[in-house]
Amino acid sequence: MKMRIQGNAIRFRLNRTEVGEFETVGKVGASIGFPGGRKLSYSLEKGGEAMGAAFDGDTIRVRVPEALAREWTGTDRVSIHEQAQGLEVIIEKDFQCLHKGEEGKDPAAYPNPMALA
């Protein structure tokens, strides 16, 4: 799962494997380790009545209501884009890169519709 933070927005991109885990388990997450043993964890979770996000000092959690999560995982819908308590939250299915280099290649990424054109 990829995370991008820009301005007052957070974006998660999930490949097919991660979307499947989110669909069946109800949660998917990742973390990055820093020197000195500290780490930042982030997760996408089903639950709540409205989309929301929380940060507790070392973990970012984004919640998606069950019905919205089911629609996103079970259809061709590419993204969820919501304002959650003043924070822009974007959840996307991750597409394969169009450039030819090895960097960023993920065999579990969704086929890029632009590559089929």
Regions found by a protein language model. Give the residues of each.
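Phosphate/adenylate-binding glycine loop and adjacent helical scaffold
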Residues: 40, 73-92, 97-104, 108-110, ...
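Residue-level detector of beta-strand structural context in well-folded domains
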Residues: 1-3, 51
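Short, structured motif recognition centered on aromatic/hydrophobic residues
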Residues: 3-5, 10-14, 60-64
